[in-house]
């Protein structure tokens, strides 16, 4: 009987959710990571034994090892587990084991999947949840319920979504991201999305996506440009809300700001309609409080709003900045300052022009060094692409303000940080 499960790279947002879920299911969980983080500290408080850094002895007496995508073959724990003949599964390979007895509601897509799955989790409040973001109403990326139903954020970046065996599948969009995993062939990525949808009994898709609009099998289709009407935004006590009408179902109000919020919520509503009546959905939508690092307001007063956002692709940044412009207009703020920590050299190099375009509407742009995420550096002339940007080595939080390494102080207007790397910590760490 497999009882003792060890996670290598347990501090990752996706893998920590799996560890939490299996612990609730009754397994004895341990894990390790390179360095301590907020997640590893929380796991320890929850009773998980976490070892820092990796050491081969950490896997002694384990029945199964699950490792994150960041783990290389030369990792001492991975190597030793192989030598000892302990079964080792990648996160992707472990999914069938984790999801085996569940009715899975899986959400995939290049953008909006965390938001869509977390809104769906608020609507289907009897379901367990495993997502790659922290749900603010629960303070965790995992919710365990004694239920057959499970809302799961499915990842296309490593094709692991094909192991999620969805009962219901939502695809928000099929824009080409993570193409390196698919041999840089868009057709392979699209084929994977088709496979993912084909398995499901119920399918909900954004039918205005260039690829999804040609999907042949039966599905519930959202045509955003005609199905979503009267989309308006408002601020209540500095909190952002978006109201919209969906098809002939009446008005809905969701926490967050921007048309993309209405789109994500609409997909979740159309999925939930298979299980709930419309008034229950309308009411439960009000429970949704957003997710950490998605238009996440860290400080707000009449003069200054400081926001942390995970956006690291031009499409996401553009959508979020359009929401920021709306917030500034409604709140009467002076200007928008964007602080950008590029994530991965390959993504930056591939989308340079699009990034430049995405930031066109801001009053000030501050650019931090690239967060490499283990990649080799690529020589790029960023100063030529962003001629008006201020390039700084670092930025830190002092009280409610931000101070750059060159001494500049950012203290008014709407300041928004973008990135999937370290920027979140920089924006949150107050130097008392």
From Swiss-Prot:
Describe the family membership recorded for this protein in Swiss-Prot or TrEMBL: Belongs to the MurCDEF family.
* Protein origin, superkingdom: Bacteria
Q: What class of enzyme is it?
A: ligase
The EC number(s) this enzyme carries: 6.3.2.8
Encoding gene, per UniProt annotation: murC
SUPFAM superfamilies cross-referenced by the UniProt entry: MurCD N-terminal domain, MurD-like peptide ligases, catalytic domain, MurD-like peptide ligases, peptide-binding domain
Q: Which PANTHER family match?
A: UDP-N-ACETYLMURAMATE--L-ALANINE LIGASE, UDP-N-ACETYLMURAMATE--L-ALANINE LIGASE-RELATED
Could you list this entry's UniProt keywords, alphabetically sorted: ATP-binding, Cell cycle, Cell division, Cell shape, Cell wall biogenesis/degradation, Cytoplasm, Ligase, Nucleotide-binding, Peptidoglycan synthesis
Q: Name one GO molecular function term.
A: ATP binding
Q: Where's it found, cell-wise? A: Cytoplasm
The pathway to which it is assigned is: Cell wall biogenesis; peptidoglycan biosynthesis
Q: Which organism is it from?
A: Campylobacter jejuni subsp. jejuni serotype O:2 (strain ATCC 700819 / NCTC 11168)
Q: Which HAMAP family is this protein grouped with?
A: MurC
Q: Which reaction does it catalyse?
A: UDP-N-acetyl-alpha-D-muramate + L-alanine + ATP = UDP-N-acetyl-alpha-D-muramoyl-L-alanine + ADP + phosphate + H(+)
Biological role: Cell wall formation.
Its predominant location is cytoplasm
Disulphide bonds annotated for this chain are: none
The name this protein goes by in its record: UDP-N-acetylmuramate--L-alanine ligase
Q: Where does ATP bind?
A: 109-115
Family matches, as InterPro entries:
Mur-like_cat_sf, Mur_ligase_C, Mur_ligase_C_dom_sf, Mur_ligase_cen, Mur_ligase_N, MurCDEF_pg_biosynth, UDP-N-AcMur_Ala_ligase_MurC
Q: What GO terms in the biological process aspect are recorded for it?
A: cell division; cell wall organization; peptidoglycan biosynthetic process; regulation of cell shape
Query: What Gene Ontology cellular-component terms does the record carry?
Result: cytoplasm
């Amino acid at each position: 009987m497999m009882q003792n499960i060890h996670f290598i790279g347990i501090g990752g947002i996706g893998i920590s959710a799996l560890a939490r879920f299996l612990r609730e299911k009754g397994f004895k969980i341990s894990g390790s990571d390179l360095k301590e983080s907020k997640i590893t500290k929380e796991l320890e408080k929850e009773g998980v034994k976490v070892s820092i850094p990796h050491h081969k002895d950490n896997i002694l007496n384990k029945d199964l090892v699950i490792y994150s995508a960041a783990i290389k073959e030369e990792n001492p724990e991975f190597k030793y587990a192989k030598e000892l003949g302990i079964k080792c599964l990648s996160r992707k390979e472990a999914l069938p084991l984790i999801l085996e007895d569940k009715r899975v509601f899986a959400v995939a897509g290049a953008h909006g999947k965390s938001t869509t799955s977390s809104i769906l989790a608020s609507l289907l409040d009897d379901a367990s949840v495993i997502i790659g973001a922290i749900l603010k109403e629960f303070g965790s990326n995992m919710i365990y319920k004694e239920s057959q139903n499970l809302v799961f954020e499915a990842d296309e970046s490593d094709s692991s979504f094909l192991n999620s065996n969805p009962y219901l599948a939502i695809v928000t969009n099929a824009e080409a991201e993570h193409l390196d995993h698919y041999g840089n062939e868009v057709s392979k990525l699209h084929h994977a999305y088709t496979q993912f949808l084909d398995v499901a009994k119920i399918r909900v898709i954004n039918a205005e996506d260039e690829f999804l609009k040609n999907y042949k099998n039966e599905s519930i289709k959202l045509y955003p440009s005609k199905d979503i009407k009267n989309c308006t935004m408002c601020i209540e006590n500095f909190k952002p809300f978006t109201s919209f009408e969906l098809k002939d179902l009446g008005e809905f109000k969701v926490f967050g700001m921007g048309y993309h919020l209405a789109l994500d919520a609409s997909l979740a509503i159309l999925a939930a309609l298979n299980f709930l009546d419309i008034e229950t959905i309308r009411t439960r939508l009000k429970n949704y409080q957003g997710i950490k690092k998605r238009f996440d307001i860290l400080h707000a007063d009449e003069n200054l709003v400081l926001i942390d956002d995970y956006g690291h692709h031009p499409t996401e940044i553009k959508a979020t900045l359009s929401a920021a412009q709306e917030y500034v207009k409604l709140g009467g703020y002076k200007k928008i300052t964007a602080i950008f920590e590029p994530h991965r050299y390959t993504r930056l190099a591939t989308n340079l022009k699009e990034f430049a375009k995405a930031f066109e509407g801001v009053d000030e742009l501050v650019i931090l060094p690239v967060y490499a995420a283990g990649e080799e550096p690529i020589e790029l002339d960023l100063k030529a692409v962003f001629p008006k940007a201020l390039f700084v080595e670092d930025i830190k939080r002092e009280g409610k303000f931000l101070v750059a390494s060159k001494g500049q102080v950012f203290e008014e207007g709407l300041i928004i940080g973008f990135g999937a790397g370290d920027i979140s910590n920089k924006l949150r760490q107050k130097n008392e």
